[in-house]
Amino acid sequence: KIGVKYKHFFIDEFQDTSILQWDNLIPLIENSLSSEESSLTISGDIKQAIYRWRGGEPEQLLNLCSNNSDFFIESNVIDLGTNYRSKDEIIKFNNSFFNHIGESVFTSLIHKNIYTNCIQQSNGDLGGYVGINILKPSEFVTKESAYNKRISGIIKDSLNNNYELKDICILVRTNNQGIEISDYLNSENIEIISSETLLMNKS
């Protein structure tokens, strides 16, 4: 009944959709698409598919753009060639980085094409900065302590270059990493706002 009620589906950030979630949606959408007045619009970026740990697979979005689609209708793929979100230097870095790993890391032709054909144009917003820090084994007491020390150093350098703490954001893979980094920065008298990690630490 739901497949009859809803005619148009729009799914944003599709790369975050798990296989289980998509398998549950397919019958509903397929039923709706049997009508000529229906449509399915999906937006996503395969390069941002970072949720393998909860069932997400980049191939899922790739298949929808190929002959392996779950549906009987032909897909119409629209590539957004201009990046309006990032500054020029970040876009240049992304183009160079993804092209490099596409050519040198992947052996599958399908995956090579994902990364080597993803060049984006700048929106004209000049500036931006990308830095990559590689830790040497000689810096390690433990991997975690080396990370914490380097993060603290980057923050202090940024403050010396007239940035403020409110300009700085740290992203981590796990909550435990967030708690550990928060504790270390507190010990360095670097003020932080991290309600989630602090709350988890107290629980």
What name fits each language-model region?
Residues K1:
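Conserved helicase NTPase catalytic core signature
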Residues V4, I11, Q15-S203:
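Conserved motor-region signature of P-loop NTPase helicases/translocases
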